[in-house]
UniProtKB/Swiss-Prot annotation:
Changing residue 436 to A: Reduced efficiency with L-glutamic acid (L-Glu) as substrate due to a reduced affinity. Mg(2+) 2 binds at residues 359, 366. This is Magnesium-dependent glutamate N-prenyltransferase. It comes from Pseudo-nitzschia multiseries. Its EC number is 2.5.1.-. Gene3D superfamilies: Farnesyl Diphosphate Synthase. Changing residue 167 to A: Complete loss of activity. Disulfide bonds: none annotated. InterPro entries: Isoprenoid_synthase_dom_sf. Changing residue 143 to M: Acquired activity on dimethylallyl diphosphate (DMAPP), but reduced efficiency with geranyl diphosphate (GPP) as substrate. The keyword Magnesium applies. Changing residue 359 to A: Complete loss of activity.
Length: 482
């Protein structure tokens, strides 16, 4: 299926950089499931011959948003379409070559809204208290577009905001990586105050119609309960804790306003609030864990910890609301929540391999690669990465088994279709994260730039495009006009 050109932003080229001029579009609340790759040339307005010439001259970048479409297209064609679900990751850790393959048996795709999201990034960055250098490294537009390929523009953007929220809170927790003597207690107090106020902002949009939903969130607050009260069917923070305005409050307000306006009137947003509570509680745990330099984690404890502080469950809870087929009851199904946790753990293990060198330099012990090396001193970085990838494969098998069990447990076809749609959201997130890591091809626009992956992709994509141009010379010239 081809996308109509009306949904594609016009592109203006200035030197090597691209600026997208957004059209006045009306963004529907729902996009039908589409295969973005089927209309790659209509989206980028480029022919294979043009792309081949550009890649040969300038290489692959992330500052030309078209390149991500062509990279995803290539990976889908070379791997998924041929039944090969093992995607290469080539990087280094402390000089050791890390050459592994991430197993992920789901179809790659990329949102047709990525061009417009990329083009409006300066406007989006103005919401944050940040620098463009830091904002570019986070590159949340890329993450959301590749992990949420079938949602509307606004719904894709809100996922980008959730990922940004995680990264900017992570920036504050990063202070705890310093030696104990260098940690400033005042900054930790500020972080504790900030996350409590962020949590309160989400509570302000939570107006459950069902008393059970109110109690579900109230009980889940756990050690945060003393800070809040139940007032007229709402959960309200005691005013004495509203001591300051956190730096990223405009971002949090933007997220809350969107959820409140777009979803709350017609859908049950309780799970979004639940996942935010889980995440904020996880950050509180992280403050404790990182602050105690003698603290160690087993691999299972690490899994449990990461289940809480991964952004994907928050993003999934929002994405679930964007689709017509939706079952709130799924969240009270232990098997479904176990599937959610497996998803978080797989993403974490993939991330650990890709961040191992950066986190080694940061002396950050909370990485499965390092935890395994502590458990088995015979492992070097490369071998430990191999073991982590094996663990990720096993977790993927558990994910697939849970998927079948959940679908078989559906009481009727309508429920089965709703569950299938919600599981698909998590599958899209998994393959999206893999592609996000594979396509880190430009320094400064990825947290973990991979020069070896860049060289590999440039060589392979050049060969692939050259074959297309050779065997379909007319099509390669004219496809952009179709």
């Amino acid at each position: 299926m081809k996308f109509a050109t009306s949904i594609v932003a016009a592109i203006a080229t200035t030197g090597a950089a691209f600026t997208v001029i957004p059209q006045k579009l009306s963004h529907p609340s729902q996009l039908n499931a589409l295969n973005t790759m089927g209309s790659i040339s209509s989206i980028t307005a480029e022919s294979p011959k043009e792309v081949l010439s550009r890649v040969q001259d300038a290489g692959l970048t992330l500052t030309n948003p078209n390149d991500l479409y062509w990279m995803v297209d290539f990976l889908k064609e070379k791997y998924y379409d041929n039944g090969d679900y093992y995607y290469p990751i080539k990087t280094v850790c402390d000089g050791e070559s890390i050459d592994v393959k991430f197993y992920c048996p789901f179809e790659p795709s990329l949102s047709p809204h990525y061009l417009e999201l990329y083009g409006s990034r300066d406007e989006r960055a103005s919401i944050y208290e940040t620098t463009m250098k830091k904002y570019n490294r986070i590159n949340s537009e890329k993450t959301s577009a590749i992990c949420t390929p079938y949602s509307s523009y606004g719904d894709t953007q809100i996922v980008a905001y959730f990922y940004s929220m995680m990264y900017y809170i992570n920036d504050q927790t990063a202070h705890l990586k310093l030696p104990e003597s260098e940690i400033e207690s005042e900054l930790i107090d500020i972080l504790n105050d900030d996350i409590l106020i962020y949590l309160n902002e989400f509570m302000s949009i939570f107006e459950p119609e069902d008393a059970q939903d109110l109690e579900r969130i109230w009980d889940f607050l756990d050690f945060y309960q003393p800070y809040f009260s139940k007032v007229d069917g709402k959960i309200v923070l005691d005013e004495k804790y509203l001591v300051r305005t956190p730096s990223q409050m405009p971002l949090i307000k933007t997220i809350c306003e969107y959820v409140s306006e777009q979803f709350a009137p017609s859908k049950n947003i309780t799970q979004v609030i639940w996942e935010v509570v889980r995440y904020i509680k996880g950050v509180k745990d992280e403050i404790h864990i990182r602050g105690d330099k003698s603290f160690t984690l087993s691999l299972q404890e690490y899994d449990d910890f990461r289940d809480k502080v991964t952004a994907s469950p928050m993003a999934h809870a929002v994405s679930d609301l964007t689709h017509e087929r939706f079952s709130y009851e799924a969240y009270t199904n232990p098997a479904f929540m176990e599937l959610e946790n497996r998803c978080s753990e797989i993403i974490t293990y993939f991330n650990d391999v890709c961040t191992s060198d950066r986190e080694r330099l940061d002396e950050d012990p909370f990485n499965s690669v390092f935890i395994l090396m502590d458990l088995d001193p015979s492992l070097n970085f490369a071998k430990s990465c191999d073991v982590v990838v094996e663990h990720a494969y096993n977790k993927m098998q558990a994910f697939l088994k849970l998927k079948e069990e959940i679908l078989e447990s559906a009481s009727d076809e309508e429920e089965r279709l709703a569950l299938a749609r919600m599981i698909k959201t998590r599958e899209d997130s998994l393959i999206g994260y893999v592609l996000h890591e594979v396509c880190c091809v430009e320094d400064g626009y990825a947290r973990d730039h991979k020069p070896l992956m860049k060289a590999f992709l440039e060589e392979e994509i050049t060969k692939s495009l050259a074959e297309k141009v050779k065997f379909n010379p007319v099509e390669s010239e004219s496809v952009r006009l179709n």
